[in-house]
């Protein structure tokens, strides 16, 4: 597979962005956040509304995340099982958009046998829906994130990207 080359080539074009093969598309519906999962229905340009998911590969240049990225206590308090939310919103807080390569492969890369039993996906997206709880925890902790995401959505809609 050439997934690393695809990410690296995209990084050379966009050195100040996080490049990810798979993203969750965030949008607003009746004033509430909603998502399209799976990595195939994506925004046509780099945006804060691409919630990166690491399961298919993501490249983080060293200067694109907020200084709070290493605040382990805050991470454990706000979204301990949702590292994708943490990394994504630390990028957004730093003013870093997430781009998806044109040749992205959003298929998850799994190590044989690791998906048996509880997984982060089953913990976060089913049952208690920890994904949405933790997302809201982060918006409550960092209110500027909510404003940034809503303004970005308005910009994307005005630009005809939806």
Language-model features: where?
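Conserved catalytic core of nucleotide-sugar-dependent glycosyltransferases
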Residues: 2-73
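C-terminal catalytic/acceptor-binding lobe
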Residues: 72-162
């Amino acid at each position: 597979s050439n997934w690393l080359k695809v990410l690296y080539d995209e990084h050379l074009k966009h050195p100040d962005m996080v490049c990810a093969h798979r993203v969750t598309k965030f949008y607003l519906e009746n004033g509430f956040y909603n998502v399209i999962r799976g990595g195939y229905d994506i925004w046509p340009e780099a945006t804060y509304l691409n919630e990166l998911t690491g399961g298919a590969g993501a490249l983080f240049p060293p200067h694109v995340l907020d200084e709070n990225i290493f605040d382990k206590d805050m991470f454990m308090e706000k979204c301990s099982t949702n590292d994708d939310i943490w990394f994504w919103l630390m990028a957004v807080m730093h003013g870093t958009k997430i781009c998806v390569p044109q040749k992205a492969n959003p298929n998850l890369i799994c190590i044989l046998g690791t998906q048996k039993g509880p997984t982060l996906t089953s913990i976060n997206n089913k049952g208690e829906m920890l994904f949405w709880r933790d997302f809201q925890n982060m918006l409550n902790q960092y209110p500027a994130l909510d404003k940034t995401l809503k303004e970005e959505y308005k910009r994307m809609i005005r630009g005809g990207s939806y």
